[in-house]
Structures are given as C-alpha cells and as structure tokens.
C-alpha cells in the first residue's frame, strides 16, 4: 500500500507539471513563473549537499493553489542532481504543501518501492504571521529515514523565520531543528540543525533590469559546521 500511495502521488505531480502551457495561457487568472538561481554551494537545512550549482524552477499559481518544479545541478562530477515537485495551497498566512524530493543516489526516478527508492515525500503545514513564520515538515513516504530501532522515524523539521529590513537590505533570520531521533538528519534526538541569516538586495543594472543577489551565513550546531553561500537570481 505504501508503494502504491507513493507511486500515485509522485505520478500525479509529474503529470500535472507536464500540462501544456498553451492551455494555461487561456486562463487569465493563472500566473506562471520561471527562473533560476546560481549559488556558490548547495546548502539545505544545515547540510551541504553540493558545490557550485544551478537551480532552475518553474511554477504555476491559480487561486491559492500552486504547482512547481525545482532542480539542482552541480558543476562537479561528485554532485548528485536533484528534481523536486511541489503541490501547495495558501490562503492568507496559512500554507499547506506536498513535496516529492528526488536526489539521484543511483536508484532511477521511476523507482517508488518503499525500500528501493531515492524519492522522499514530505508534507508541510505552516503559518506566516508577517513578523514570524512557523513551518512544520514531516517525511511521510519513500526514503524518509529511520530511528535507532530501524523503524520509520517520520523524520521531521520545524523552522522559524523572521524577516526584517535594515540598511536598505532585506534580511531573514532562521532557526531550524529536527524534534526527534532519525538518520535522515543524522540526529540522536532533538537537534538544532540550522541557525542562519540571509541578506537580499536587487542591484540595478539598467533602468529596466535589476539583478537580485543574496548571501546567507548558516551554522549547524549539531555538526559544528558553518557555511557562507552567495547567489544570483535570474
């Protein structure tokens, strides 16, 4: 049953992503976006997943519902490629989403068996109070991690983010933690995985074009590792 649920969920996300954009354009209220980030290193939730990377994305939004695809391709041969699909809903500050993460660790994209897959299906729920956003994430299927007893851990992550402006720059402070033991985040119990500060600014190139840049300083107290990431958005 777990295999079938995982397969149906992932295939639904893939099929919806492949809907022709000619059909989408006929609906005036649908908004579409496409772009890419170029980052000095791929850092996620206090973990370095790769070096210099290109991260393209494409998405559509309609009345609070959104469907998006995001990828990561590193320039180093040791970097694993990643493709993620997210189906989400938001209303005011409330948000709910389902994300299929796939990192190419050697098992093909079309492998969905519970113990023979590189897919991870994650559910998210959160609320943005403007001054503070709270988000909870839980892995519900796929290669989602186990606890010390070898049982499914439902590996989870909770994030608190606080945006603010200072000196003409937009800042975001964040702290993220995993609440219980799991090998997905390499935690033996409650563990703070990331404390970070990100700065964002648009540099005006011409009257009609500005280049968004960002820099993020992140620390993982659990591993005593620190990262400084720079990126450009196009």
Predicted features, each with a name:
Residues 34-42, 65-75, 95-104, 108, ...:
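Transmembrane beta-strand segments that form the barrel wall of outer-membrane beta-barrel proteins
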Residues 30, 50-54, 79-83, 92, ...:
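Residues that define the transmembrane beta-barrel architecture of outer-membrane proteins
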Residues 27-61:
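Outer-membrane beta-barrel initiation region
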Residues 197, 203, 223-234:
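Outer-membrane beta-barrel "beta-signal"
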Residues 1-31:
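Cleavable N-terminal export/targeting peptides
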